Regions:
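Bacterial N-terminal signal peptides
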Residues: 5-17
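Metallo-beta-lactamase
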Residues: 23-29, 35, 119-186, 267-289
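Conserved beta-strand hairpin/beta-sheet module of binuclear metal-dependent hydrolase folds
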Residues: 25-82, 171-192
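Pre-active-site segment of Zn-dependent metallo-hydrolases
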Residues: 47-95, 105-108, 160-164, 197-206
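Active-site neighborhood of phospho(di)ester-bond hydrolases with catalytic His/Asp-centered motifs
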Residues: 51-52, 89-98, 118-121, 188-194, ...
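Active-site environment of divalent metal-dependent phosphoester hydrolases
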Residues: 56-58, 98-103, 125-127, 143-144, ...
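Active-site HxH/HxHxD metal-binding segment of metal-dependent hydrolases
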Residues: 60-62, 81-143, 156-159
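Cap/insert and terminal regions of metallo-dependent hydrolase folds
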Residues: 75, 195-283
């Protein structure tokens, strides 16, 4: 059994911060651990889900072409601890999509081939099966895994104007978000690589999540003055729609094309007096809800 006390002991031994926040139903078994970039471990009791693993060492890949600061190599920082700790106790992996900063060759190599892998569509499933993964599952609208209900939410990886331009539209591709629910535990909405859309608004209204994970690095491609994911102002939008929810801001300080850093977002949060609602975890930090 994956006892919470053992998990906390591990956190303390590694010198990694663990913070507790009230969100939704009383619970001591729901947590989100920020790993790096968009990689996170979501724990519901004895179930541990790994989202969007990018596991390479610092500087393993060239910067994304035709993007902001493309001269930098990715990832721009190391993992906060070794890959063995990242994969410890993981029961399944979920991919919002298969861009390099969410699913990379290191993850392909290091994740066990029998691991349950949840993906958004057949193209991503075929990609993983081609790498030898034996238990690849295409997510329907709703599915239950080990007592956790996972629902898909539509996402849009850039503006409507960007999707009018080829080959950019093909490069951006399709993405999904997830809602995680379990009886007696807080509901978590992980929006994924998306800009603000009616689907995001609809998911917040429909599911009334207690915790909302936003990718707020405001990544930019050349030729456009808006991002392909959310930025600082989206934290205000989400807070206005879900004022009691805890917002967890990630996908910063790890790949070349992010234009918003944690420091930038902290300044914005202070200016807007959102400190009690917007959480900005460091790599390796665990947030308990």
């Amino acid at each position: 059994m994956k006892l919470l006390s053992l998990a906390l002991a591990t956190v303390l031994a590694l010198g990694i911060q663990a913070s507790s926040y009230a969100a939704g139903p009383a619970s001591t078994t729901t947590s989100i651990q920020q790993i790096r970039n968009a990689t996170a471990k979501i724990t519901y009791g004895d179930t541990v889900l790994l989202v969007d693993p990018m596991l390479a060492a610092k500087g393993a890949y060239p910067g994304f072409p035709d993007t902001y600061r493309s001269e930098l190599r990715n990832p721009t920082v190391e993992l906060p601890f070794d890959v063995g700790q990242v994969l410890k106790d993981v029961d399944a992996v979920l991919l919002t999509h298969t861009h390099l900063d969410h699913w990379d060759p290191a993850a392909e190599t290091l994740i066990p081939r029998q691991m349950p892998m949840f993906v958004q569509h057949e193209a991503d499933a075929a990609l993983l099966r081609g790498k030898g993964f034996a238990d690849v599952r295409i997510l329907p609208a709703h599915v239950t895994f080990d007592g956790v209900t996972i629902s898909r939410v539509a996402a849009q990886h850039g503006s409507a104007a960007m999707f009018q331009v080829e080959p950019l539209a093909t490069m951006l591709g399709s993405v999904t978000g997830f809602v995680f629910q379990k009886t007696g535990e807080p509901t978590i909405y992980l929006a994924g690589d998306t800009v603000w859309t009616g689907d995001v608004r609809g998911a917040i209204k429909r599911y009334a999540p207690d915790v909302i994970v936003l990718n707020t690095g405001d990544a930019r491609v050349k030729g456009f003055d808006t991002g392909i994911i959310m930025g600082v102002e989206d934290t205000s939008r989400v807070h206005a729609l879900a004022p009691t929810a805890k917002i967890v801001a990630v996908h910063m300080d790890a790949v070349n094309h992010m234009t918003v850093s944690r420091a930038d977002l902290r300044r914005y949060v202070r200016e807007k007096a959102l400190q009690d609602s917007v959480l900005i975890p460091e790599d390796g930090e665990t947030l308990n809800f």
